[in-house]
Regions:
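Flexible "cap/lid" loop of the alpha/beta hydrolase fold
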Residues: 14-19, 23-58
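Short beta-strand/loop motif that positions the catalytic acidic residue
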Residues: 118, 124-126, 130
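Conserved alpha/beta-hydrolase catalytic His-Asp/Glu region
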Residues: 38-43, 56-117
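Catalytic histidine-centered segment of alpha/beta-hydrolase-like enzymes
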Residues: 153-166
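Core-facing hydrophobic residues within beta-strands of well-ordered domains
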Residues: 23-25, 145-148, 156
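Conserved alpha/beta-hydrolase "acid-adjacent" motif
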Residues: 131-137
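Active-site loop->helix "elbow" adjoining a glycine-rich segment at hydrolase catalytic centers
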Residues: 7-10, 20
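Alpha/beta-hydrolase fold nucleophile elbow
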Residues: 1-7
Length: 167
């Protein structure tokens, strides 16, 4: 199969590549979690201070969170911010638990030393201004995965497929 994922989905893709190498033809990673680069991200610094910068407490926080995720502001109409907030509020406890588990797994149990076991050709796509997972992870991935190449987009944050879909 061909697999790809962004952020946590990229971590799942990478884990799949390690666990089922015989089933994988190729992989695309977009700003994936699961490795530690030379530099800490703004999210890691906030998390070390006990803060979750992705947490939403009001519809206005949706705007702040999206500005943290994307390099250029995303325009989301007020009614959609309200819906986004309401969905987040329903699942706040679970989302917070997932966030802290990812922070722990991403920094406490990184896959850096297993990357050489990835056999599938891998394309690494990253936004230079990712505040969630530092762009220094690109070098770790490209150096660690034997058949990998990377593309780093300028003026893009954590979601290159949304911020620069034609890239």
């Amino acid at each position: 199969c061909h697999i790809g994922g962004n952020s946590m989905g990229g971590f799942v893709s990478l884990r799949f590549a390690l666990d089922y190498p015989e089933r994988l033809i190729s992989m695309t990673l977009f700003n994936n979690a699961g490795v530690v680069g030379a530099n800490e991200s703004k999210l890691q610094i906030e998390a070390q201070a006990g803060k979750n910068p992705l947490e939403i407490h009001s519809p206005d926080d949706v705007k702040r969170m999206l500005a943290f995720v994307a390099h250029k502001p995303m325009k989301i109409p007020g009614q959609f911010r309200k819906i986004f907030y309401e969905d987040f509020a329903v699942h706040r406890e679970l989302l917070d638990k997932i966030f802290w588990n990812l922070v722990e797994d991403g920094t406490g149990k990184p896959l850096n030393d297993q990357l050489d076991q990835v056999k599938a050709p891998t394309l690494i796509i990253w936004g230079r201004h990712d505040q969630l997972i530092d762009v220094s992870c690109v070098n770790v991935l490209e150096d660690g995965i034997p058949n990998a190449e990377s593309v780093v987009f300028e003026d893009v944050g954590h979601v290159p497929m949304i911020e620069n879909p034609k890239g």
